[in-house]
Amino acid sequence: MGNPLLDISAVVEQDILDKYDLQLNNAILAEEKHNPLYKEMVDKYPVEYIAGGATQNSIRVCQWMLKTKGATTFIGCIGEDDFGTQMTNACQADGVTTKYMIDKSTPTGTCGVLVKDGERSLIAALNAANNYKFEHLQEAENWKIVEDAKFYYSAGFFLTVSPDSMMAVAKHSAENNKCNMM
């Protein structure tokens, strides 16, 4: 479980970093002043879209290492939009099963990845990723995934999003002698 973010990555010029008060080798949460940044990146630079977020990145690497399609599952919240569709398709192409909760009122979370001279600046807009609900995890098909899994991984960021979900998985893993990693 974690915060799924669609990375929007581009090699940029210094002017866009200055315009949005961004520093290289830094990671921040987006503020209102950053809202136009993502569209500006798309309009001004060739961009690459990558399924991201700390936990989802780790799950994708694990899936790649295991080399068995569907060996991993990622749970989180996305918006009902093109970015959510792109992220779902990217994960499926990587062999990761996704069980996203769909938030119809909030856009999919994004992370601007601005690269200059081999260094980067990250600007995360959590959006729907911040809206995951415990009730989604409790749905029979999702809880079955928890029951069937042997290992669980989540970044600590998710504790602020759905502590009940984190505690339920921790309790299940402890009661069933399974490995829960954070």
Q: Whereabouts are the PLM-identified features?
A:
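Ribokinase/PfkB-type carbohydrate-kinase core domain
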Residues: M1-N25, V47-I50, T68, C77-G79, ...
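Short catalytic helix/loop segments, enriched in acidic residues and glycine
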Residues: D15-D43
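Short amphipathic alpha-helical segments at helix-loop
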Residues: K39-D43, A71-T72, S154
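Active-site alpha-helical elements of protease catalytic centers
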Residues: Y49-T73
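A general structural signal for well-ordered alpha-helical segments in protein cores
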Residues: T55-I59, G84, M166
